[in-house]
Amino acid sequence: MSRRTRSRSPPRRSYNRERRDYRKYDDSEDQKGARYNRYVDDVSSRRDRHDSFRSHESNKIRRDNSWKHDKYSYEKRYQERDREYARSKNIPDQYIGRSPRPTSHRHAEEKEVDNKTKSDETNPVLQGSATEIKPQPRRSRFDRTERVGASLSVSEIQSENPRVDVIPKDKAVENNHQRNAEKPVASDKITDAKLLARLERVRAWKESKAKQEASKKEEHKLNTKPQVTAKDQNAMPSTGISGFEINRQKDTSDMKRNNRVHMDDEDGPRRMNLEDYQELWDQEDRGMLGNEQAASMEEDEVDPLDAYMASLVGTTDTIRPGLLNTEVIDPNANDDERMVISETLEEEENLLALAAKRSKKKDVITVDHSKINYEDFKKDFYVEPEELKNLSPAEVDELRASLDGIKIRGIDCPKPVTSWSQCGLSAQTISVINSLGYEKPTSIQAQAIPAITSGRDVIGVAKTGSGKTIAFLLPMFRHIKDQRPLKTGEGPIAIIMTPTRELAVQIFRECKPFLKLLNIRACCAYGGAPIKDQIADLKRGAEIVVCTPGRMIDVLSANAGRVTNLHRCTYLVLDEADRMFDLGFEPQVMRIINNIRPDRQTVLFSATFPRAMEALARKVLKKPVEITVGGRSVVASEVEQIVEVRPEESKFSRLLELLGELYNNQLDVRTLVFVDRQESADALLSDLMKRGYTSNSIHGGKDQHDRDSTISDYKAGVFDVLIATSVVARGLDVKSLQLVVNYDCPNHMEDYVHRVGRTGRAGHTGVAVTFITPEQEKYAVDIAKALKMSKQPVPKELQTLASQFLEKVKAGKEKAAGGGFGGKGLSRLDETRNAERKMQRKAYGEDEEDVETEAEAKSPLEKITPEKSTGDPTLDRVRAAVGGIAARAFANQTAQSNKLTQPISIIKTDGDEYKAKMEINDYPQQARWAVTNNTNIVHVTELTGTSITTKGNFYLPGKNPEPGEEKLYLWIEGPSELVVNRAITELRRLLLEGINHSLEGGNKPSASGRYTVV
């Protein structure tokens, strides 16, 4: 029972009315007697009990205050009782009055007075003596000194302090022998040879360490550098762990051990020497000598610590786990040896870092097609109908002209069909087509389906909403059904890659009506959705995979490539291929394509296909047939295009006017508003909601789940107005969408065509309104061109803006706007990288040094001799281009290596301090970040023991600092030239990593809205 619980017992219990001592009694009978006496004497009235209770409460409060300082205080009357009890039990006088627990320092004087009074009254030897006796201090169970017993003399007891004898070792051993002689079983001599050998090793080891201690201390004094204080208030100290000086005069027991760097007095790291524990062991030995039992243990039993440490002599030193990352260097090694070891360790760390980086990088396992025996497959299924065989070339040209002017590039292209029955489709496919309401093939379908079914690689270019998806889906179903079913562990037969997630979902939904009847399984793999569900679908088996390039790379590289593979893939579709390459997916697309068998069938479709994309497309195609319907980048004739030139302030009011006119006349219609930026989409959404229009926004900054649900609600009619960026400019198909508003003018013609093409699909009509401000005159040229190509009237205001801009371009006052997606892909990547490298070389001042290397990189490509030629001109051009890229990469790498290897001067100050200045202003942003972020700075300072400070200001290339200012640089300070050089080497390594990362990933698309693969 606790103290507080006992003190608050009810007052009706008679034995708790009076104040009593709450210490623990040793005799239970004494407790019972005291309780009985108090119970018999308690015959007071109720009032007395009440007064007693009040007294009890006041005493309790006073007692609680006393317990705050001394938990076990005594009163005079209870001490007298203890003395009587001690006499009855024959307890020695010296223990009378001693508390079984230590008292507080605050009441030490009171305890001494109580003990003196008790001793004077009870000890007959000390009665009448004027000498005060102080109580014996409480000894810990860990004390090895001899306790003073009752047999001590009076003079010893009367001494000022209690005596603690320290018996010499030889005397202790002698006394131990005498005591052991009285024991019949004890032995006077150790006969265990193993124990004697251990004792001998311990003595020899202690003697050798004692001899080395003096020489080591003197050597340490010589090597210790004088302490230098920082003169600048903002400057960091130059020595110590992490750049801070450690006051080694203080006790270092409270210092936290660093798990990475061993806190040592020397500049460089050293081994953990056993002599560091010598002082601790000597103190332990001195404590053992003061105890007789310790003296006997010296001969009978070896201390476990000494025996264990002695067994380690001659073995390899073990480094603590916390020091695994620390360099282990001999403390007696000179500076040259330390530098060699340091460079070796740095090289190993670089290799480990590179290996870790490569292990984290997701990459598809490269497939050697020459070592794989692929199954044969058939891709020519087309049988020309009898009614088409008899058509003459003139009649075929007339038929193609009637189908929106189909243009063909390539040889042996099949004739276009006029009905579904001529396509050679199965009965199940025809039934699904009829249920969907497709009466006859569209222009692109009439020509593309026979071409793809005959096994040709096809490039299909057609206007938006012309049915391009069905044009490659129907031949794909026929292609899949001709092959054997999938086995466990086999990958898909057909892959459809798209640039956006919304387009992938759209194509997957168009596949669904055919899958059940044809007994085909499909999987949609795109970013933002849980990858575990997609992996589960692939493991169950899927003949069709609709995917985005990034997620397909994740799936192929997951679990070391054991999730799925591309060995069975024979049909590849690249939908909106120009946009895929423009978004920077060219490396991912090529990695996927290179892992598909070379004799595959490849199909490319898009509404816009610039000429500059042809060379890129032909890398993945073999003798393709190009089918163009209605021209390149042409808006469908079903769309009414309206272009208005108006200031920025009037656009919102005009938008409200258009929405009011539309919804006053029609109810179940949809409106799509395009803006340029995500912030503009959210701001416009807020404004429309305030005006009472049910609307929502979609852009790349939203989660994929939100984007999918937004499109589903938009198609279902939950809201009528959708505000979006160009993320839905391709693939979005909503039948009731009748109004498209380009709130922000598109910056090139291809984007304009795709935005406007969201309406007027599948034969329906629609309206597209575009707002353009007078400041956006450079975009007026492309919009006017699109109107002319689609045979729409061009407004006078728009034509005036276009003419004014063209005049400025001719006069050299303006630069022509970009031509959309043309010239992008690999060409854009190479040009951008070359421009960045030129800027970096110019900033580094390396133009003159790298003239020869740059000339070699720009030299004409090596001619492919007939012996080296592969027979394929496309492959030969690719090999030559790869050689040129390798030469440019080598030139850039050489230039940066020359810059980083330039020496940096180290200055020695008067206070034996070494300083160095390392400029970082002209390096790329990622390289500057690598050497200025706190994590790397702390790592370098802990590794080298230097102080690194970032000083100066950053200036853009071509700008000079103001008078009295300096460009951005690192100020390195250290106690020796060795540590400063090591810091410079480590910083150069970080700079090189940052430069390489900047060159490799500088042109990758932003990761906003991307998924995270766990």
UniProtKB/Swiss-Prot annotation:
A motif (Q motif) lies at residues 418-446. Residues 1-11 have a biased composition (Basic residues). Changing residue 575 to A: No effect on ATP binding. Loss of ATP hydrolysis activity. Loss of function in pre-spliceosome/complex A assembly. It is an enzyme of class 3 (hydrolase). It catalyses: ATP + H2O = ADP + phosphate + H(+). GO terms for molecular function: ATP binding; ATP hydrolysis activity; nucleic acid binding; RNA helicase activity; U1 snRNP binding; U2 snRNP binding. GO terms for biological process: mRNA splicing, via spliceosome; U2-type prespliceosome assembly. Transmembrane segments: none annotated. It holds the Pfam family KH_12. Residues 638-802 form the Helicase C-terminal domain. Its main location: nucleus. The keyword ATP-binding applies. Residues 1-149, 815-875 are annotated as: Disordered. Its EC number is 3.6.4.13. It is found in: Nucleus. Residues 449-627 form the Helicase ATP-binding domain. GO terms for cellular component: cytosol; nucleus; U2-type prespliceosome. The Q motif is unique to and characteristic of the DEAD box family of RNA helicases and controls ATP binding and hydrolysis. ATP-dependent RNA helicase involved in pre-spliceosome/complex A assembly and mRNA splicing. Bridges U1 and U2 snRNPs during pre-spliceosome assembly and enables stable U2 snRNP association with intron RNA. Through its helicase activity probably catalyzes an ATP-dependent conformational change of U2 snRNP. This is Pre-mRNA-processing ATP-dependent RNA helicase prp11. The gene is prp11.
